[in-house]
Curated annotation (Swiss-Prot):
It is a multi-pass membrane protein. The keyword Transport does not apply. This is Photosystem II CP43 reaction center protein. One of the components of the core complex of photosystem II (PSII). It binds chlorophyll and helps catalyze the primary light-induced photochemical processes of PSII. PSII is a light-driven water:plastoquinone oxidoreductase, using light energy to abstract electrons from H(2)O, generating O(2) and a proton gradient subsequently used for ATP formation. Residues 1-14 form a propeptide. PSII is composed of 1 copy each of membrane proteins PsbA, PsbB, PsbC, PsbD, PsbE, PsbF, PsbH, PsbI, PsbJ, PsbK, PsbL, PsbM, PsbT, PsbX, PsbY, PsbZ, Psb30/Ycf12, at least 3 peripheral proteins of the oxygen-evolving complex and a large number of cofactors. It forms dimeric complexes. GO terms for cellular component: chloroplast thylakoid membrane; photosystem II. It comes from Pinus thunbergii. The modification N-acetylthreonine is found at residue 15. The modification Phosphothreonine is found at residue 15. It is found in: Plastid, Chloroplast thylakoid membrane. GO terms for biological process: photosynthetic electron transport in photosystem II. Keywords: Acetylation, Chlorophyll, Chloroplast, Chromophore, Manganese, Membrane, Metal-binding, Phosphoprotein, Photosynthesis, Photosystem II, Plastid, Thylakoid, Transmembrane, Transmembrane helix. Pfam families: PSII (PF00421).
Amino acid sequence: MKTLYSLRRSYPVETLFNGTIALAGRDQETTGFAWWAGNARLINLSGKLLGAHVAHAGLIVFWAGAMNLFEVAHFVPEKPMYEQGLILLPHLATLGWGVGPGGEIVDTFPYFVSGVLHLISSAVLGFGGIYHALIGPETLEESFPFFGYVWKDRNKMTTILGIHLILLGVGAFLPVLKALYFGGVYDTWAPGGGDVRKITNPTLNPSAIFGYLLKSPFGGEGWIVSVDNLEDVIGGHVWLGSICIFGGIWHILTKPFAWARRAFVWSGEAYLSYSLAALSLFGFIACCFVWFNNTVYPSEFYGPTGPEASQAQAFTFLVRDQRLGASVGSAQGPTGLGKYLMRSPTGEIIFGGETMRFWDLRAPWLEPLRGPNGLDLSKLRKDIQPWQERRSAEYMTHAPLGSLNSVGGVATEINAVNYVSPRSWLSTSHFVLGFFFFVGHLWHAGRARAAAAGFEKGIDRDFEPVLSMTPLN
């Protein structure tokens, strides 16, 4: 009878601060950790920690599947993806599923399949997580020594690192297989406004691939974010996958050298801090990639980049006024510079006006109109295609400059659509997450180094403020 809600609601609420709940191994008295530091109780329980990790993976994959199906259910084929707040379907479309010429979505069934596969996978992971958290052995060392470990066992840790690297390498080869053998990927640069194509000749020249790493991150250089063709993208995945797999084999077969044993802190919290630093770096790179790059993140799905929307505005009005009889090659603007076209400091012909700052934009709808010295005046007069006009007008009104209340667009564009671009969502979220992961890295690295030096064991729990507070009931 006690379990009936009608009876139970009158009983006092017990909190973990009371010490009266008999939860051996889960309360502060028996573990030394308060409720909010729950993960710390699993530091030396490899079986339970495995359960936590598998369950976490299940939550991640469940989100991916559920959000995928949610986006499929809400998708309207007549509207561009970027106007519908989608962040998962653009990734699937970029991989070449369900897409036709010009980025038109011709089939949503592959997206449905993707969502269902992720949901089924999440159920398997969820079951495994619950099993290992509640039923399986607390520690793996006795029953399954291959999966067991001690945090300070340097050789075992680098073996685990090696296994992870091999899995990452296999993952890096998946887009390679899709691009080369399984239908190809979407190429925004394909003639006529983009199409799905197989990448038959990936760039394997190391000077081309590693040249990106040696570029400046600033200005027109743009480090790896400046990649502008799928041959280099897929070739980079071949190199990265190979390096990860060979590096993984190396770390499995070798023991850490003396300099590495001295240089690193070898504890669970130290490994956590290294992982957080890596994820932080990934977040910052992803932020820049999705904001600036329109090859890996095609504008057909993610909307235009900021510079792209600005240049599209200049192009749209050049087209309009040229039709009305303006001499776009010689017309002066209010500052005495060219109204439609001007010269960059190095002599190329570029769009005039405020968009001059984005003169080095490269976009598939604009490149056909360039000559050896910037924009080609005769091409602008004779060769502009209807699809280029349509696309630039669309991009002009969909700049990725939305604020939280969706009042967005280029400030000088009265026709701007009120929406928040997926580029805004993805770049902002990855920057913020990257920043907080970096703070987490500093926090855990500091604690791990202090613990290794022997002068910091965490907060002194005898004087923790919560211990002197009145229980909540």
